[in-house]
């Protein structure tokens, strides 16, 4: 498809030609119309003859060849516990949708999470870092604590909601603090993620350890920000973490310190922050989110009910008990395939263990015990 007209606006993520908005990622070629046509007196197709001003406007126009399907924003809510409701699989799915539109898409992760499992964050960070090579990731942050904050820092841009909190990327093992050596490895990993996003490495240590310092000074003229890992005692220095607490940023702090790209409380405001003409959600991220959350709820409910049934099998004969146990364990195997994260957190025997348990019960049935 070719679009002709006067170039009205050239924004960061799109061009506006006449009244048509075209995303930069959609543009294949741009041709200047400064040179006269073969017959400058011949009116343009569909235009009345003698309309010189219209012809002159067409002469000054640019012609852009674009794909017929205009891409936009791919929105994915990410809420709940990191490693359970919030996981990398949905990121993979939304990227697959974006890939169909070509490179250069904008993927918005709407993050509302108090944290969770570190290993799952590592998988999510690796997923985001890999796909950032061809798409832009935006973290739209409300509550982003611990592993959720680290996920946001893996994105190219961070936009805060007014009630946002981001930080406190602490590590624990079964509720207990981890060793200093483990924390240092975690800090090194976080620094690497920050580099891929273009953020200062100064953020890593004070968000992980409460015995660290981060402050900054913003140049009032240029807006440039300089970060410090120790007190400077200079005019304008703003302290965010002071040796006694993990760094947790509010919306005001995130924006003023330069970590956040802007602030938005709804999708229309977010579109403006991202320099988009309007909000245009082209993916099915909301459905992905809702489907997975519903699966987690159904899984937990079913495990609770079937576990209760196991405790009430005493009223049946031994042969019936064996069959009902096999039925329940096979049901659990199906849930392992549908919701492995939930099954792990619920402490259900692994697939291998269940298969061995089923095999043993089937052997007892064959031998006719009971």
Predicted regions span which residues?
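Conserved RNA-binding domains used in RNP assembly and mRNA/RNA metabolism
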Residues: 1-56
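Soluble non-cytosolic domains of exported or imported proteins
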Residues: 21-24, 81-89, 115-122, 143-146, ...
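Intrinsically disordered, low-complexity segments enriched in small/flexible residues
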Residues: 33-63, 200-205, 209-229, 271-370
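STAS-typified acidic loop motif
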Residues: 64-90
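Second-shell loop/turn segments in exported
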Residues: 75-85, 108-115, 138-142, 171-181, ...
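A short, well-ordered alpha-helical element
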Residues: 84-105
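Glycine-rich beta-to-alpha active-site loop
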Residues: 113-182, 186-189, 210-221
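Charged, glycine-interspersed solvent-exposed loop segments at helix/strand-loop junctions
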Residues: 172-289
């Amino acid at each position: 498809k070719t679009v002709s007209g006067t170039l009205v606006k050239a924004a960061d993520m799109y061009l506006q030609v006449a009244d048509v908005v075209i995303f930069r990622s959609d543009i294949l070629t741009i041709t200047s119309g400064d040179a006269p046509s073969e017959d400058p007196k011949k009116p343009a197709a569909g235009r009345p003859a003698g309309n010189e001003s219209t012809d002159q406007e067409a002469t000054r126009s640019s012609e852009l060849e674009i794909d017929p399907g205009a891409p936009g924003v791919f929105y994915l809510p990410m809420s709940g516990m990191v490693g359970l409701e919030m996981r990398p699989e949905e990121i993979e799915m939304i990227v697959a949708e974006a890939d169909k539109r070509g490179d250069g898409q904008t993927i918005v992760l709407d993050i509302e999470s108090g944290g969770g499992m570190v290993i799952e964050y590592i998988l999510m960070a690796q997923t985001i870092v890999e796909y950032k090579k061809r798409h832009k990731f935006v973290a739209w942050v409300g509550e982003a604590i611990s592993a959720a904050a680290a996920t946001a820092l893996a994105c190219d841009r961070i936009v805060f909601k007014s009630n946002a909190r981001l930080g406190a990327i602490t590590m624990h093992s079964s509720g207990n603090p981890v060793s200093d050596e483990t924390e240092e490895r975690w800090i090194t990993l976080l620094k690497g993620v920050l580099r891929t996003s273009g953020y200062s490495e100064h953020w890593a240590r004070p968000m992980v350890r409460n015995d660290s310092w981060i402050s900054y000074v913003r140049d009032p003229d240029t807006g440039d920000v300089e970060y410090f890992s120790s007190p400077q005692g200079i005019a304008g220095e703003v302290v965010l973490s002071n040796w006694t607490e993990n760094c947790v940023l509010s919306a005001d702090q995130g924006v003023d310190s330069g970590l956040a790209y802007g602030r938005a409380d709804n999708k229309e405001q977010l579109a403006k922050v991202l320099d988009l003409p309007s909000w245009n959600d082209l993916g099915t991220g909301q459905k992905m989110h809702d489907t997975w959350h519903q699966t987690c709820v159904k899984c937990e409910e079913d495990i609770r009910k079937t576990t209760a049934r196991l405790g009430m099998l005493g009223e049946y004969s031994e042969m019936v008990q064996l069959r009902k146990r096999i039925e329940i364990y096979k049901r659990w195997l199906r849930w392992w395939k549908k919701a492995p994260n939930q099954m792990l957190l619920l402490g259900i025997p692994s697939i291998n263990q269940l298969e061995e348990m089923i095999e043993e019960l089937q052997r007892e049935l064959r031998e006719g015990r009971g």
